Curated annotation (Swiss-Prot):
Family membership noted in the UniProt record: Belongs to the PNMA family.
Pfam families referenced in this protein's UniProt entry, alphabetically: PNM8A (PF20847), PNMA_N (PF20846)
Top-level taxonomy: Eukaryota, Metazoa, Chordata, Craniata, Vertebrata
Biased segments, Basic residues type: 231-249
Protein's name according to its UniProt entry: Paraneoplastic antigen-like protein 8A
Bias-annotated ranges (Basic and acidic residues): 314-326, 395-404, 423-439
Organism, as annotated: Homo sapiens (Human)
UniProt cross-references to InterPro entries, sorted A to Z: PNM8A_C (IPR049131), PNMA (IPR026523), PNMA_N (IPR048271)
Stretches the record annotates as Disordered: 208-439
Highest taxon above the source species: Eukaryota
Length: 439
């Protein structure tokens, strides 16, 4: 058996039997058939002079096919004095023990370590709670039994190592506990976030309500409540005469062309100042020729509707002059043919006849009043676009004639004739209605 194997076997055996290795010996080379009495007799001749001893146990070594014995010596025995080999049965028996030089080298290294750490042997004893009287009394003097002192020191070092190991383990456990707490907090925060997502609050309900709103609904409401802005703007910027009329009549308001309010405002305006109505009709006839916009047609229709309504809302008994002229259309045509011009009161008479007897007028399909002819079929024909007279050289003169005093009777107007053949007639169904209301 090699020396290294024998030393390893000694260390393991001492650790297993809890024996101090500094007082233990390993004797190898004992034959297999050698008994206990013979082994003790051989060892007694070698170890008895050195001090007391005892055989602890025996073991069989398979590699060498021999036995080995573990021997423990007394406290006063110096291991360096024990021989390493001695004769026995079957050959030479060898002795293996811890080398004292190894212990000296260990002590040297330990002292250097304590000096580097700034520690002393007293600190080691205090930390390990070892109360040794020899160390406290004789600090600088080496102990009498250095082997015993070395054993105590080794025990203290082992205890220090165990304490350091326990401290390191406690720190690791604390770190592991902190990591576990952190993971638990993270899991709790994640669960709380999921709970908040599952149970939204008032802000989430408001957000869902806002998402439910669609832009189409807003567009629909805007389309319903938004007025017809282009038509109002065009009506406001139509002509200067209309602006002047709106300024004079403060009660009249601009209304979209789709919904005319009626004939009250127009009739009152015509009753107050008939010249303003004539100027308005003249101003409207001028843009009809120059512009082709659909807005002008809407304005004309809005002006025609009150005229038709006035014809039906007039008094049942028209003036006598109007009846006479309506009954004799032939005389009117003759006077027109002689003079070559039409008179304004004849148009009023026709309007009154159509308002009074709408059914008989269907038979009279056409009434000629000089160069201008009017078709009277039904009350619906009042909605049709009337024939607007063209401008002629005598239109301005007729306009000057129209500025006559308001007190002229229709009978006096029939005798006078206009100079221009294509001049606009002075009277209109609207004015006739207004005059009838005055009467």
């Amino acid at each position: 058996m090699s020396k290294t194997m024998a030393m390893n076997l000694l260390e393991d055996w001492c650790r297993g039997m809890e024996v101090d290795i500094h007082r233990s010996l390993l004797v190898t080379g004992i034959p297999e058939d050698c008994g206990q009495a013979e082994i003790e007799e051989t060892l007694n001749g070698v170890l008895s002079p050195l001090g007391p001893y005892r055989v602890l146990n025996k073991i069989f070594v398979r590699e060498e096919n021999v036995k080995a014995a573990l021997i423990e010596v007394g406290e006063g025995v110096n291991l360096s004095t024990i021989p390493r080999e001695f004769p026995g049965r079957g050959g030479v028996w060898r002795v293996v023990c811890r080398d004292p030089t190894q212990d000296a080298e260990f002590l040297k290294n330990l002292n250097e370590f304590l000096d580097a750490e700034g520690r002393t042997w007293e600190d080691v004893v205090r930390l390990l709670q070892l109360n040794h009287p020899t160390l406290s009394q004789n600090q600088h003097q080496p102990p009498e039994n250095w082997a015993e002192a070395l054993g105590v020191l080794l025990g203290a070092v082992v205890q220090i190592i165990f304490c350091m190991d326990a401290e390191i383990r406690s720190r690791e456990e604390a770190r592991a506990q902190e990591a576990a707490e952190f993971e638990e907090m993270a899991a709790w925060a994640l669960a709380a976030g999921r709970k908040v997502k599952k149970e939204p609050g008032l802000a989430a309900e408001v957000g869902s309500a806002l998402k439910a709103e669609t832009p189409n609904n807003w567009n629909a409401t805007e389309d319903q409540h938004e007025p017809t802005k282009p038509l109002v703007r065009r009506a406001g910027a139509k002509s200067r005469s209309r602006r002047k009329k709106q300024k004079k009549n403060s009660r009249q308001e601009a209304v979209p062309w789709k919904k005319p309010k009626g004939i009250n405002s127009n009739s009152t305006a015509n009753l107050e100042d008939p010249e303003v109505g004539d100027a308005e009709s003249m101003a409207i006839s001028e843009p009809i020729k120059g512009s082709r916009k659909p807005c002008v047609n809407k304005e004309e229709l809005a002006l025609k509707k009150p005229m038709a309504k006035c014809a039906w809302k007039g008094p049942r008994e028209p003036p006598q002059d109007a009846r006479a002229e309506a009954e004799s259309p032939g005389g009117a045509s003759e006077s027109d043919q002689d003079g070559g011009h039409e008179s304004p009161p004849k148009k009023k008479a026709v309007a009154w006849v159509s308002a009074k007897n709408p059914a008989p007028m269907r038979k009279k399909k056409k009434v000629s009043l000089g160069p201008v002819s009017y078709v009277l079929v039904d009350s619906e024909d009042g909605r049709k676009k009337p024939v607007m007279p063209k401008k002629g050289p005598g239109s301005r003169r007729e306009a000057s004639d129209q500025k006559a005093p308001r007190g002229q009777q229709p009978a006096e107007a029939t005798a006078s004739t206009s100079r221009g053949p294509k001049a606009k007639p002075e009277g209109s169904p609207r004015r006739a209605t207004n005059e009838s209301r005055k009467v």
